Amino acid sequence: MKTVNKIIGAILFVALNPLSAFSQTVSTDFENQETRNTELQISIVPYLGTNGKNSGITTNDFSFNLFGGYSAGTNKLEMASLFNINRLDAKYVQLAGIFNQVGGKVEGAQFAGIANANLDSIRGVQGAGIVNFTTGAVEGTQLAGITNFTSKSVRGFQGAGIVNFAGQELTGFQGAGIANFAGGNVKGTQAAGIVNFTPKDVQGVQVAGILNFARKVNGSQIGLFNYADSISGAPIGLLSIVKSGYHTLEIGTDEILPINLSFRTGTRSFYNMLFVGIRPEITDYTVWAFGYGIGTSPRLGRKTFLNIEASSQQLNRGNVEALNLINRFYVGADFQVARKVALFAGPSINFRVYDTSYNQHPDLFTYSGPKVFSERNYRFDDLASQFWWGFRAGIRFF
């Protein structure tokens, strides 16, 4: 991971520093010379100003540059319409129309129309229209239109339109339109439009539009897909995989289909269900169903758990031709009869919504005869609904 961070950092450094060759050459020229300090620098471009050829060995309290400025460092304020280049440290305010480049530490506020690039740490605020780049630690805030990058840790806030990257630990908040990456532990919140990723641990919350990935999570994950080795809270999403969590394969029956297969994954506090069912009949067509659900399973005793589940399944006769949705709320008991084997059973209340314009729906009850106690036809969209009490029972392996 450290090698990858160094490679990425090197690539970004070259890409983000159009005058890097210039600054490195000048730094070599001045590295053995003693720096001096002045209260004020006024320049048009590097070396064409009040400090002249001594620009690279002079730190300025104030520096005002018509197009661009170059100095050993800034102590209070630096401004330029295009760019500022500091060989060493910069504080407390640095403003540029295009980019700021600092070879040392930054303390205070650094704002640029396109990019900020620092070769050491920053303590304060960085704001750039496109990218903030630093090879040192960040303590404070980074705001960028596209990306924030640091090869070290972040303690504070990263907000980017596309990507945030912290090579080491994150303590605070990462918010990005597409992705957040932290190479070390995360203590706080990651929120992204697509993906949050850390190969280490999270103490807090990950929220993503598609994927959250972490090792050990002491908190929660909220996303379409979630992955963690272990998690103390609830992974909420379409599909959550917790390596040391709750995984079961179920063979069961209900009042509609005698054979159902279901897979549960997540944690007992919150899990997802994927299932299919079939009615084994010798006919010209097959009655089958597929569906999805969510549930929770609190412990009742040493070997007994409660199941509270909500699910929906599409019941079909051959191909999927029309809406025929069975929505089920189930409350049952799960009893551990052996290691990794459990029996379950319980009642359910069912709400069917179906398309009345289609007349080839399969019969609901072939092997049992529940009584439908409520039927209703809707005036719009050729829809109707039914209510009835049912059951579920079977065996689970995990």
Provide a role label for each language-model segment.
Residues 1-27:
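Bacterial Sec-dependent N-terminal signal peptides
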Residues 64, 113, 129, 145, ...:
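Membrane-embedded beta-strand positions of outer-membrane beta-barrel proteins
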Residues 64, 222-224, 238, 259-265, ...:
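Residues on the lipid-exposed face of transmembrane beta-strands in outer-membrane beta-barrel proteins
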Residues 233, 283-285, 317-320, 354-358:
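Outer-membrane beta-barrel proteins
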Residues 58-60, 216-218, 253-259, 268, ...:
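Residues that define the transmembrane beta-barrel architecture of outer-membrane proteins
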Residues 229-232, 268, 334-398:
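Predominantly the C-terminal beta-signal and adjacent terminal strand-loop region
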Residues 66-70, 83-85, 99-101, 115-117, ...:
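Transmembrane beta-strands of outer-membrane beta-barrel pores
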Residues 105-107, 121-123, 137-139, 154, ...:
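Repeated loop/turn-to-beta-strand initiation elements of outer-membrane beta-barrel proteins
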